[in-house]
Design a protein with these regions (language model features):
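Active-site-proximal alpha/beta segments of enzymes that process anionic O-linked groups
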Residues: 2, 14-138
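Short, hydrophobic/glycine-enriched beta-strand segments
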Residues: 4-11
Length: 138
């Protein structure tokens, strides 16, 4: 059986501060924490594309703040790879255009000023579990 994958990206968070949240500490105990990482590009939109393609922005097409939507079609993209392997894929972002829709079965956009940040991610996971209908999910 394929494992479910929950990828959490904390934007602007320092490693020495993540242990403040009891919920996040529980998540760390049950999963894998990468505690020695360096960003490949100094802004979130580019960095998430580097993580999900395995290629620097120069190669994947997202090499500038205003090039978020320029992910090259020929570049392998983790959500597509997992989708092709039978995973149900979903994501939740503050703006849909931050990341290519390629390979995502379900996308949710949030208003960071109006929604409770402590509730939105558990709701996304619950929605993902329901929509995945027994398939492994990412």
């Amino acid at each position: 059986m394929k494992p479910n994958i929950i990828f959490v990206l904390l934007d602007g968070s320092r490693f020495d501060r993540i242990h403040i949240s009891p919920e996040f500490c529980d998540l760390i105990k049950q999963g894998t924490l990468l505690d020695n990482v360096t960003t490949a590009i100094p802004y979130t939109f580019g960095a998430i594309n580097v993580i999900l393609t395995g290629e620097y922005g120069k190669e994947n097409g997202v090499d500038g703040f205003y090039k978020v939507s320029k992910l090259k079609k020929q570049v392998s993209f983790l959500p597509e790879i997992l989708q092709n392997e039978g995973y149900f894929t979903s994501r939740g972002l503050i703006r849909d255009e931050i990341l290519s829709p390629r390979g995502f079965d379900f996308r949710k956009e949030y208003n960071e000023y109006e929604e409770d940040l402590n509730l939105r991610h558990p709701e996304l996971i619950k929605d993902t579990i329901e929509k995945s209908k027994g398939k492994p999910f990412f």
